[in-house]
């Protein structure tokens, strides 16, 4: 039985770090790693949307992950997003992530074309096979990927024992409940994790069953999300809602720009 408690909590999406010339800043990545560890984050999600994964060369993604791991290994949970717009690069990044010692790899589905479910499953399973000793997280973000995680596809992926979680960034919190129920049905209580993705609904996702959150603004205001998580764990829902409301107003202002 896997111990998945290392994934339960507040996991900031790690930001892309560049120097003044637009190159990957390893020193910036190391500094951000140390900062977020000091703040009390449960882990990091490296190379995802906030890490500008789709815009980076695989070598840049490797370089940033190596910088993070040089500071984080053995101290904090690290999930590396390895999805690319082709299987070969995705597989290469998966193998690299395992070689540097991440806790899990993750991936969005193939983007642009709406591929059949068997093709999406093969894409994910090929990555997982390239990192056979590393756990796998499905990243569901249909509004950007163009393809959503269906229950039939999730059930197919649950045949892979390394698939231990879904990061759910769709807006309906009902999806969290459905994915969680499917995971429990297949694996048993405590053996499947669902992350809340949308920052503006952290509390609502946790209340309906998410084990933690994985979001893009956690790294700039971690204290609020850590407080919300603590409130939710103690069923202090009024306090949690108050912080959530404040954070949501900040997000709405950011989105107005």
What is the predicted function of each stretch?
Residues 129-130, 142-256:
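Catalytic alpha/beta core domains of metabolic enzymes, predominantly
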Residues 1, 13, 99, 233-242:
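Polar low-complexity intrinsically disordered regions
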Residues 1, 35, 96-97, 157, ...:
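A general structural signal for stabilizing positions within well-ordered secondary structure
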Residues 43, 256-257:
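Short amphipathic alpha-helical segments at helix boundaries and their inter-helical linkers
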Residues 2-148:
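Active-site beta->alpha loop and helix N-cap motifs at the rims of alpha/beta catalytic domains
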